[in-house]
Protein backbone atom coordinates (compact mmCIF):
# COMPACT_ATOMS: atom_id res chain seq x y z
CA UNK A 1 0.00 0.00 0.00
CA UNK A 2 0.87 3.71 -0.04
CA UNK A 3 2.22 3.73 3.52
CA UNK A 4 4.42 0.67 2.98
CA UNK A 5 5.94 2.16 -0.15
CA UNK A 6 6.78 5.39 1.66
CA UNK A 7 8.27 3.46 4.60
CA UNK A 8 10.63 1.61 2.26
CA UNK A 9 11.55 4.89 0.56
CA UNK A 10 12.43 6.51 3.91
CA UNK A 11 14.44 3.48 5.07
CA UNK A 12 16.44 3.65 1.85
CA UNK A 13 16.97 7.42 2.06
CA UNK A 14 18.26 7.13 5.62
CA UNK A 15 20.45 4.11 4.84
CA UNK A 16 18.84 2.19 7.68
CA UNK A 17 21.04 -0.85 8.45
CA UNK A 18 19.05 -3.71 6.92
CA UNK A 19 20.67 -7.15 6.74
CA UNK A 20 17.54 -8.78 5.38
CA UNK A 21 14.22 -7.22 4.37
CA UNK A 22 11.10 -9.33 4.90
CA UNK A 23 8.04 -7.90 3.10
CA UNK A 24 4.88 -9.20 4.79
CA UNK A 25 1.30 -9.04 3.54
CA UNK A 26 -1.98 -10.93 3.42
CA UNK A 27 -2.11 -14.33 1.75
CA UNK A 28 -3.35 -12.92 -1.56
CA UNK A 29 -0.08 -11.00 -1.97
CA UNK A 30 2.28 -13.82 -0.95
CA UNK A 31 4.86 -14.52 -3.65
CA UNK A 32 4.82 -11.05 -5.14
CA UNK A 33 8.15 -9.25 -5.35
CA UNK A 34 9.12 -5.94 -3.75
CA UNK A 35 12.10 -3.90 -4.93
CA UNK A 36 14.29 -2.37 -2.24
CA UNK A 37 17.53 -0.59 -3.18
CA UNK A 38 17.83 -2.62 -6.37
CA UNK A 39 17.20 -6.02 -4.77
CA UNK A 40 14.01 -8.06 -5.18
CA UNK A 41 12.37 -9.53 -2.07
CA UNK A 42 9.45 -11.95 -2.09
CA UNK A 43 6.39 -11.16 0.02
CA UNK A 44 5.68 -13.74 2.73
CA UNK A 45 2.65 -14.43 4.92
CA UNK A 46 2.27 -13.40 8.55
CA UNK A 47 3.06 -16.74 10.20
CA UNK A 48 6.12 -17.25 8.01
CA UNK A 49 7.37 -13.82 9.08
CA UNK A 50 6.80 -14.64 12.76
CA UNK A 51 8.81 -17.85 12.38
CA UNK A 52 11.69 -15.91 10.80
CA UNK A 53 12.17 -14.03 14.12
CA UNK A 54 13.14 -10.65 12.71
CA UNK A 55 14.69 -7.98 14.93
CA UNK A 56 12.09 -5.35 14.04
CA UNK A 57 8.62 -5.51 12.49
CA UNK A 58 6.94 -2.33 11.28
CA UNK A 59 3.16 -2.73 11.16
CA UNK A 60 0.83 -0.60 9.04
CA UNK A 61 -2.01 -3.01 8.33
CA UNK A 62 -4.87 -1.71 10.46
CA UNK A 63 -5.86 -2.20 14.07
CA UNK A 64 -7.43 -5.65 13.82
CA UNK A 65 -4.37 -7.14 12.14
CA UNK A 66 -2.10 -5.52 14.70
CA UNK A 67 -4.09 -6.76 17.69
CA UNK A 68 -3.98 -10.31 16.30
CA UNK A 69 -0.40 -10.49 15.09
CA UNK A 70 1.74 -8.00 17.04
CA UNK A 71 1.68 -10.17 20.21
CA UNK A 72 2.79 -13.20 18.16
CA UNK A 73 5.76 -11.30 16.72
CA UNK A 74 6.60 -9.95 20.19
CA UNK A 75 6.46 -13.44 21.70
CA UNK A 76 9.00 -14.55 19.08
CA UNK A 77 11.38 -11.83 20.26
CA UNK A 78 10.64 -9.27 17.55
CA UNK A 79 10.23 -5.60 18.47
CA UNK A 80 7.02 -4.34 16.86
CA UNK A 81 6.52 -0.71 15.84
CA UNK A 82 2.81 -0.31 15.13
CA UNK A 83 1.38 2.45 12.95
CA UNK A 84 -2.29 1.78 13.76
CA UNK A 85 -4.29 3.16 16.67
CA UNK A 86 -4.70 -0.31 18.23
CA UNK A 87 -2.11 0.05 21.01
CA UNK A 88 -2.00 3.83 21.54
CA UNK A 89 -4.48 3.95 24.42
CA UNK A 90 -3.16 0.84 26.20
CA UNK A 91 -1.77 1.97 29.56
CA UNK A 92 1.20 -0.39 29.50
CA UNK A 93 2.23 0.43 25.92
CA UNK A 94 4.53 3.35 25.13
CA UNK A 95 3.40 5.97 22.61
CA UNK A 96 6.68 7.18 21.17
CA UNK A 97 7.97 10.15 19.22
CA UNK A 98 11.75 9.46 19.21
CA UNK A 99 12.77 13.11 19.54
CA UNK A 100 10.59 13.46 22.65
CA UNK A 101 10.37 10.25 24.67
CA UNK A 102 12.52 7.49 23.13
CA UNK A 103 14.53 7.42 26.36
CA UNK A 104 11.55 5.86 28.15
CA UNK A 105 11.87 2.64 26.12
CA UNK A 106 13.34 -0.53 27.62
CA UNK A 107 14.14 -3.99 26.24
CA UNK A 108 10.81 -5.15 27.64
CA UNK A 109 8.88 -2.81 25.33
CA UNK A 110 8.24 -5.26 22.51
CA UNK A 111 5.17 -3.47 21.10
CA UNK A 112 5.71 0.25 20.53
CA UNK A 113 2.82 2.44 19.39
CA UNK A 114 3.42 5.08 16.73
CA UNK A 115 1.22 8.18 17.25
CA UNK A 116 -1.23 9.62 14.75
CA UNK A 117 0.47 11.70 12.04
CA UNK A 118 -1.30 14.96 12.95
CA UNK A 119 -0.32 14.47 16.60
CA UNK A 120 3.37 13.88 15.84
CA UNK A 121 3.88 17.14 13.99
CA UNK A 122 2.12 19.14 16.72
CA UNK A 123 3.88 17.60 19.73
CA UNK A 124 7.32 17.99 18.14
CA UNK A 125 6.74 21.75 18.34
CA UNK A 126 4.88 21.71 21.67
CA UNK A 127 7.16 19.47 23.78
CA UNK A 128 10.19 21.81 24.02
CA UNK A 129 7.92 24.79 24.68
CA UNK A 130 6.13 22.88 27.45
CA UNK A 131 9.47 22.28 29.19
CA UNK A 132 10.20 26.00 29.17
CA UNK A 133 6.81 27.66 29.69
CA UNK A 134 4.39 24.92 30.93
CA UNK A 135 1.44 24.49 28.55
CA UNK A 136 -2.05 24.94 30.01
CA UNK A 137 -4.24 24.66 26.90
CA UNK A 138 -3.98 23.90 23.18
CA UNK A 139 -6.53 24.76 20.48
CA UNK A 140 -5.77 23.14 17.13
CA UNK A 141 -7.53 23.23 13.76
CA UNK A 142 -6.15 20.89 11.11
CA UNK A 143 -6.17 21.05 7.32
CA UNK A 144 -5.40 17.46 6.39
CA UNK A 145 -4.32 15.89 3.12
CA UNK A 146 -6.57 13.30 1.49
CA UNK A 147 -3.62 10.89 1.48
CA UNK A 148 -4.48 10.26 5.12
CA UNK A 149 -7.61 8.51 3.87
CA UNK A 150 -5.76 6.44 1.27
CA UNK A 151 -5.50 5.64 -2.43
CA UNK A 152 -9.29 5.70 -2.92
CA UNK A 153 -9.45 9.33 -1.77
CA UNK A 154 -6.64 10.36 -4.12
CA UNK A 155 -8.50 8.67 -6.98
CA UNK A 156 -11.74 10.46 -6.02
CA UNK A 157 -10.01 13.84 -6.22
CA UNK A 158 -8.38 12.98 -9.55
CA UNK A 159 -11.74 11.85 -10.97
CA UNK A 160 -13.56 14.97 -9.75
CA UNK A 161 -10.82 17.22 -11.11
CA UNK A 162 -11.17 15.52 -14.51
CA UNK A 163 -14.99 15.50 -14.38
CA UNK A 164 -15.16 11.69 -14.26
CA UNK A 165 -17.68 9.70 -12.21
CA UNK A 166 -16.09 7.10 -9.95
CA UNK A 167 -15.98 5.49 -6.52
CA UNK A 168 -16.29 7.90 -3.59
CA UNK A 169 -14.00 7.70 -0.56
CA UNK A 170 -16.03 10.46 1.08
CA UNK A 171 -19.76 11.12 1.36
CA UNK A 172 -19.25 14.43 -0.45
CA UNK A 173 -17.08 15.82 -3.27
CA UNK A 174 -13.60 16.77 -2.09
CA UNK A 175 -12.54 18.84 -5.13
CA UNK A 176 -13.04 22.55 -4.31
CA UNK A 177 -14.36 21.52 -0.91
CA UNK A 178 -13.38 21.17 2.75
CA UNK A 179 -14.95 18.37 4.78
CA UNK A 180 -15.05 18.94 8.58
CA UNK A 181 -14.89 15.23 9.33
CA UNK A 182 -11.75 13.10 9.61
CA UNK A 183 -12.74 9.56 10.67
CA UNK A 184 -16.02 8.65 12.40
CA UNK A 185 -17.80 10.62 15.11
CA UNK A 186 -17.67 9.72 18.80
CA UNK A 187 -20.49 10.23 21.31
CA UNK A 188 -19.13 13.61 22.42
CA UNK A 189 -19.48 15.04 18.90
CA UNK A 190 -15.76 14.97 18.16
CA UNK A 191 -14.27 12.73 15.48
CA UNK A 192 -11.81 9.97 16.31
CA UNK A 193 -9.07 12.04 14.65
CA UNK A 194 -9.81 14.99 16.92
CA UNK A 195 -9.79 12.86 20.06
CA UNK A 196 -6.46 11.30 19.02
CA UNK A 197 -4.99 14.80 19.10
CA UNK A 198 -6.34 15.25 22.62
CA UNK A 199 -5.36 11.93 24.19
CA UNK A 200 -2.09 11.33 22.38
CA UNK A 201 -0.73 14.80 23.09
CA UNK A 202 -1.25 14.32 26.82
CA UNK A 203 0.29 10.83 26.79
CA UNK A 204 3.38 11.70 24.73
CA UNK A 205 4.22 14.87 26.65
CA UNK A 206 3.37 13.04 29.87
CA UNK A 207 0.98 15.61 31.33
CA UNK A 208 -2.75 14.86 31.56
CA UNK A 209 -3.44 18.37 32.86
CA UNK A 210 -2.84 19.88 29.41
CA UNK A 211 -6.26 20.81 28.00
CA UNK A 212 -6.56 20.13 24.26
CA UNK A 213 -9.45 20.79 21.89
CA UNK A 214 -9.34 20.03 18.17
CA UNK A 215 -11.21 20.44 14.89
CA UNK A 216 -9.94 18.25 12.04
CA UNK A 217 -10.78 19.11 8.43
CA UNK A 218 -10.04 17.22 5.22
CA UNK A 219 -8.93 19.46 2.33
CA UNK A 220 -8.21 18.69 -1.37
CA UNK A 221 -4.43 18.45 -0.99
CA UNK A 222 -2.26 15.45 -1.85
CA UNK A 223 0.48 15.18 0.78
CA UNK A 224 1.09 17.39 3.80
CA UNK A 225 -1.06 18.16 6.85
CA UNK A 226 -1.31 21.74 8.14
CA UNK A 227 -2.34 22.91 11.61
CA UNK A 228 -3.28 26.26 13.11
CA UNK A 229 -2.23 25.89 16.75
CA UNK A 230 -3.01 28.24 19.63
CA UNK A 231 -1.14 27.56 22.88
CA UNK A 232 -1.76 29.06 26.32
CA UNK A 233 1.17 28.83 28.74
CA UNK A 234 1.27 29.10 32.52
CA UNK A 235 4.29 31.39 32.17
CA UNK A 236 4.97 34.34 29.91
CA UNK A 237 7.32 33.97 26.96
CA UNK A 238 9.41 35.87 24.47
CA UNK A 239 8.53 35.25 20.80
CA UNK A 240 12.17 35.45 19.71
CA UNK A 241 13.09 32.90 22.36
CA UNK A 242 10.28 30.61 21.13
CA UNK A 243 11.76 30.75 17.62
CA UNK A 244 15.21 30.00 19.02
CA UNK A 245 13.95 26.99 21.02
CA UNK A 246 12.19 25.56 17.97
CA UNK A 247 15.22 26.28 15.77
CA UNK A 248 17.30 24.01 18.03
CA UNK A 249 14.67 21.24 18.21
CA UNK A 250 15.52 18.01 16.36
CA UNK A 251 13.07 17.33 13.53
CA UNK A 252 11.78 20.92 13.40
CA UNK A 253 12.55 23.54 10.75
CA UNK A 254 11.48 27.12 11.45
CA UNK A 255 10.20 29.01 8.38
CA UNK A 256 9.16 32.36 9.76
CA UNK A 257 10.32 35.45 7.89
CA UNK A 258 7.49 37.77 6.93
CA UNK A 259 9.82 40.10 5.01
CA UNK A 260 10.53 37.32 2.51
CA UNK A 261 7.05 35.74 2.80
CA UNK A 262 8.62 32.62 4.28
CA UNK A 263 6.16 30.30 6.01
CA UNK A 264 5.35 26.58 5.84
CA UNK A 265 3.14 25.24 3.07
CA UNK A 266 2.09 21.62 2.40
CA UNK A 267 3.15 21.81 -1.25
CA UNK A 268 6.78 22.29 -0.22
CA UNK A 269 6.70 20.00 2.82
CA UNK A 270 5.65 16.97 0.79
CA UNK A 271 8.32 14.26 0.75
CA UNK A 272 10.35 15.86 3.55
CA UNK A 273 10.80 14.39 7.03
CA UNK A 274 10.96 17.59 9.09
CA UNK A 275 8.08 19.43 10.75
CA UNK A 276 7.90 23.02 9.52
CA UNK A 277 6.79 25.79 11.89
CA UNK A 278 5.99 29.39 11.04
CA UNK A 279 3.61 32.34 11.58
CA UNK A 280 4.90 32.34 15.18
CA UNK A 281 3.25 35.25 16.97
CA UNK A 282 1.78 36.32 20.28
CA UNK A 283 -2.00 35.93 20.67
CA UNK A 284 -3.00 39.48 21.55
CA UNK A 285 -6.46 38.41 22.76
CA UNK A 286 -5.26 36.17 25.61
CA UNK A 287 -2.41 36.44 28.15
CA UNK A 288 0.59 34.08 27.78
CA UNK A 289 -0.76 32.71 24.49
CA UNK A 290 0.96 31.92 21.20
CA UNK A 291 -0.15 31.17 17.63
CA UNK A 292 1.78 28.87 15.27
CA UNK A 293 1.29 27.33 11.83
CA UNK A 294 2.65 23.77 11.68
CA UNK A 295 3.03 21.75 8.46
CA UNK A 296 4.37 18.26 7.81
What are these regions, as identified by a protein language model?
Residues 8, 198-202, 243, 247:
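Generic solvent-exposed, charged/amphipathic alpha-helical segments
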Amino acid sequence: GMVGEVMLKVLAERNFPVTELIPVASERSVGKEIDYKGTKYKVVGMQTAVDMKADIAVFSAGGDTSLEWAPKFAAAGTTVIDNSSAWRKKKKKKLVVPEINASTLTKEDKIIANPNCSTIQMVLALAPLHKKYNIKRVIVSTYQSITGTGVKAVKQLENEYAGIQGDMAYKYPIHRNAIPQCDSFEENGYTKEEMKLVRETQKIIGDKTIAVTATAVRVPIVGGHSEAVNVEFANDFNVSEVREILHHTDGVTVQDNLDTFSYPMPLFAQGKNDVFVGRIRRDESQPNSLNMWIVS
